[in-house]
């Protein structure tokens, strides 16, 4: 109990600190727009998108730890995750060498990030709703599921703005997100828990990919030099 309390206090401090500086990637909190649409520089948009992705990844890691603790309290240890069926079927790989980084385009980076972001929007909404029905779900876990759902939707809006700014109108044909309902439906209580855990378990991995790809995009657009993941 003491360990859980300390963990929750630390998490609240970190999340609140990050939230204090991160709104939506497309907000203009420091400008008096007087009813006119504000204009944010590309550098600022990329900076906010990276910050958003970092926050989302951080919350996903925390959520996984909190879910692990909840499973232990339920007497469940080493819950098996079948990544082939529960994780994103559209694999977006992170470049593994300097040669690969040089070969990929900014369009590929934007498209890959958008695919990952859009894929997880509905599953995260479903997990948020599902956790509300748990009898003993920690409030910290429920709160983080809501925050993940909100932030991933905000990040999608920011990515769409970045696509228009970097590639221009029509520069990337944006398809609707893949229907993931068949991947995450279950009426069995244990399978529901497994499904919810699988979503968080898999999402934190893709959240790290999103963060990595956005950092690379920001470097290529703004810094221009020494853009490497190594």
Curated annotation (Swiss-Prot):
GO terms for biological process: animal organ development; growth hormone receptor signaling pathway; positive regulation of growth; positive regulation of receptor signaling pathway via JAK-STAT; response to nutrient levels. GO terms for molecular function: growth hormone activity; growth hormone receptor binding. Glycans are attached at residue 226. Pfam families: Hormone_1. One of its GO terms (cellular component) is extracellular space. Disulfide bonds join 28-38, 87-202, 219-227. The keyword Transmembrane does not apply. PROSITE patterns: SOMATOTROPIN_2. Its main location: secreted. InterPro entries: 4_helix_cytokine-like_core, Somatotropin/Prolactin, Somatotropin_CS. Belongs to the somatotropin/prolactin family. This is Somatolactin. It comes from Carassius auratus (Goldfish). The lineage of its organism: Eukaryota, Metazoa, Chordata, Craniata, Vertebrata.
């Amino acid at each position: 109990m003491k360990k859980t309390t300390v963990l929750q206090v630390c998490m609240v401090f970190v999340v609140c600190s990050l939230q204090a500086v991160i709104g939506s990637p497309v907000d203009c909190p420091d400008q008096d727009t007087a009813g006119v649409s504000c204009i944010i520089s590309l550098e600022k948009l990329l900076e906010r998108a990276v910050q958003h992705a970092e926050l989302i990844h951080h919350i996903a890691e925390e959520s996984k730890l909190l879910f692990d603790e909840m499973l232990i309290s339920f007497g469940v240890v080493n819950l098996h995750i079948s990544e082939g069926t529960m994780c994103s079927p559209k694999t977006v790989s992170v470049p593994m060498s300097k040669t690969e980084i040089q070969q990929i385009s900014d369009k590929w980076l934007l498209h890959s990030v958008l695919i990952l972001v859009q894929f997880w929007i509905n599953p995260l909404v479903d997990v948020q709703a599902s956790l509300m029905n748990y009898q003993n779900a920690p409030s910290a876990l429920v709160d983080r599921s809501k925050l993940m759902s909100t932030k991933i939707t905000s990040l999608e809006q920011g990515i769409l703005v970045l696509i228009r700014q970097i590639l221009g109108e029509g520069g990337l044909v944006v398809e609707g997100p893949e229907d993931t309902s068949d991947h995450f439906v279950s009426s069995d209580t244990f399978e529901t828990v497994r499904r919810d855990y699988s979503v968080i378990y898999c999402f934190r991995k893709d959240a790290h990919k999103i963060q990595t790809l956005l950092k690379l995009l920001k470097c290529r657009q703004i810094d221009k030099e020494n853009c490497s993941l190594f």
